[in-house]
């Protein structure tokens, strides 16, 4: 555990996916107490939210100290985000690239909204550390996943709420293969297996097809990234 955070509480943005589960384990290995926040925004893959309880149980079973540290689980419903978005994550349309070079899975402002609500909740609960799974390395070009966006949000939220927030993004500079390795470093094969079997990444919400790397359609960008990362991780472990 880092001595710098050994007495602190963190709030983790926890969707039930691979990245956020890895970030949750990362936080549990560093902070004295960890709370989580998930969002129901009308996403097609809302099945990810149902995965969280199984992941909580699995994490508690992996390490007794993690069980002691896991605090309150929060869920916020923000259907307005889907109402104002015309994307493949919130509409039953095919996934494709847009004219602007971004995939139509991009939900404009999603991470900005998530971080704002997270900071508001953290403020009320006396928490200054917020952990998110944003990543610049293996991402689809989403502008709200960039490090400069996260740093700008940290400054804006700290100014706007007169509270010195620190936004932690442990996956920002690593790819999916390294994310699998990080999970192993944090919790061994037990955590890797838990993420494979219980987390959800597929944009289409497919839980009927199981692969070596987990459940999903196997075709969408999220599944492709997860599978590619898994294959590279397995090849080098």
Swiss-Prot record:
**Per the entry, which co-factors are needed?**
Zn(2+)
Q: Which UniProt keywords apply?
A: ATP-binding, Ligase, Metal-binding, Nucleotide-binding, Queuosine biosynthesis, Zinc
Sites where the protein binds Zn(2+): 202, 217, 220, 223
CDD domains named in the record: QueC-like
Q: What EC number(s) are associated with this protein in UniProt?
A: 6.3.4.20
Catalytic activity reported: 7-carboxy-7-deazaguanine + NH4(+) + ATP = 7-cyano-7-deazaguanine + ADP + phosphate + H2O + H(+)
Q: Which family does it belong to?
A: Belongs to the QueC family.
Task: State the protein's name.
Answer: 7-cyano-7-deazaguanine synthase
Entry-linked InterPro entries: QueC, Rossmann-like_a/b/a_fold
Q: Which GO terms describe its molecular function?
A: ATP binding; ligase activity, forming carbon-nitrogen bonds; zinc ion binding
């Amino acid at each position: 555990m880092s001595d710098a955070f050994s007495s602190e509480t963190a709030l983790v943005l926890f969707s039930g996916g691979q990245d956020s589960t890895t970030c949750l384990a990362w936080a549990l290995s560093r902070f004295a107490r960890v709370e989580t926040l998930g969002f129901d925004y009308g996403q097609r893959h809302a099945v990810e939210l149902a995965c969280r309880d199984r992941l909580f149980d699995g994490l508690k079973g992996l390490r007794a100290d993690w069980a002691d540290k896991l605090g309150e689980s929060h869920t916020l419903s923000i259907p307005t985000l889907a109402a104002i978005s015309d994307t493949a994550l919130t509409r039953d349309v095919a996934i494709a690239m847009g004219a602007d070079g971004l995939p139509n899975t991009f939900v404009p402002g999603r991470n900005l909204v998530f971080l704002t609500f997270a900071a508001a909740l953290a403020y009320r609960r006396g928490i200054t550390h917020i952990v998110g799974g944003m990543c610049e390395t293996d991402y689809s070009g989403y502008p709200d996943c960039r490090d400069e966006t996260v740093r700008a949000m940290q400054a804006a939220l700290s100014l706007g709420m007169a509270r010195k927030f620190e936004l932690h993004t442990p996956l920002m500079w690593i790819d999916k293969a390294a994310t699998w390795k990080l999970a192993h470093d944090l919790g061994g094969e037990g955590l890797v297996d838990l993420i494979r079997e219980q987390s959800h990444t597929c944009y289409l919400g497919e839980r009927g097809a199981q692969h070596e790397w987990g459940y999903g359609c196997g075709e969408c960008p999220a599944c492709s990234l997860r599978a590619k990362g898994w294959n590279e991780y397995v090849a080098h472990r």
